[in-house]
A protein has these predicted regions:
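Structural beta-alpha unit
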Residues: 1, 41, 77-110, 211-245, ...
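Small/aliphatic-rich secondary-structure junction motif
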Residues: 1-56, 135, 152-221
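Amphipathic coiled-coil/heptad-repeat helices and related helical stalk/stem segments
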Residues: 19, 96, 125, 166-169, ...
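Gly/Ser-rich helix-loop-strand patches that form or flank binding pockets
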Residues: 20, 25-29, 99-148, 236-279
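A structural preference for short, hydrophobic beta-strand core positions in alpha/beta folds
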Residues: 36, 88-91, 142, 185, ...
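A short acidic, glycine-rich active-site loop
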Residues: 56-71
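P-loop/Walker A phosphate-binding loop and immediately adjacent motor/lid segment at beta-alpha junctions
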Residues: 74-82, 120-144, 206, 210-219
């Protein structure tokens, strides 16, 4: 089992090259076809026409970004040729929230970057990460804006709550889990889950995964006072040297998580390791 078609989203941020390198490593590992999708945020021109000289500013910004995209395309073709990876390049013809999910549905795995508050080029579209993971129907691998993550997939942490989303994520991550040196199923409790008695226990999930992987263990932990499940997961991942976190996304109603926060948003904002999410 493996990913035979990988889609990587590339933008004009400083981390685009590192994301491409990671995608190339995975394409070689799984003998997969690699598609790069260039999609960047471009403001509507009408928003610039309210002030004198703003139209010229918009034109200059667009030309500068077009130059960076062209350079990125040349780099992509050079790197895939060097790595002998089957590849193609797609330039988005619409807003990212429309075009990226559409192309993602043709892939086995989608790779995108984490938003960096210090790099405006990582802003792609309104709530882009949330929209993608909810609408793509494919596993999305979010890559942090720091680090090279060379060991990705050797030590996997599966966040488990017995939900449909958790089951989907675990199975979507199976190509990683099958070759991992260690897989840990971690169930984080906070004592406030009304459906806990009907969810699949972590031990049962570990037993299922053990039929695919060589070293699987299970860990049940409780959130400390005032701690969130998302922060607890990230802390445990750091403490155990995990290099891939696998989790279901938006198990609660999306409006509730977007308004009140939640595990998904906490992890997307604070992650320091790659995170594979499925909905």
């Amino acid at each position: 089992m493996g990913y035979k078609s990988i889609l990587v989203h590339l933008d004009t941020s400083d981390r685009a090259h590192a994301r491409l390198e990671l995608a190339l490593r995975l394409a070689r590992r799984f003998d997969a076809h690699l598609t790069a999708l260039s999609a960047i945020y471009t403001p509507e021109p009408v928003s610039f026409y309210v002030m004198a000289g703003s139209a010229d500013y918009f034109r200059e910004q667009r030309e500068r970004r077009d130059e960076r995209v062209a350079a990125l395309e040349r780099l992509f073709h050079a790197e895939t040729t060097r790595a002998k990876v089957s590849a193609d390049w797609i330039a988005a013809d619409a807003r990212a929230n429309t075009v990226v999910p559409r192309h993602a549905r043709h892939a086995d795995l989608v790779i995108v970057g984490q938003s960096d508050p210090n790099d405006p080029e990582t802003y792609i579209d309104d709530q882009f990460p949330e929209n993608l993971v909810l609408s793509a129907g494919r596993p999305v691998l979010f890559v942090p804006y720091a680090g090279d993550h060379a060991s990705l997939g050797e030590r996997v942490l599966v966040a488990w709550d017995g939900s449909r989303e958790a089951v989907r994520a675990a199975h979507d991550a199976m190509p990683f889990i099958e070759h991992a040196k260690r897989t840990t199923v971690v169930a984080v409790g906070n004592g406030n889950d009304p459906d806990a008695n009907v969810r699949i226990p972590g031990a049962d999930a570990a037993l299922m995964l053990a039929r695919h992987a060589s070293d699987v263990n299970v860990l049940d932990i409780e959130c400390g006072p005032g701690a969130s499940i998302g922060d607890t997961l990230l802390s445990r991942a750091y403490e155990t040297g995990t290099d891939l976190l696998v989790m279901g996304a938006y198990g609660h109603a999306r409006w509730r998580e977007l308004v009140m926060g939640g595990v998904t948003r906490t992890v997307l904002a604070s992650m320091t390791l790659p995170v594979l999410m499925s909905h």
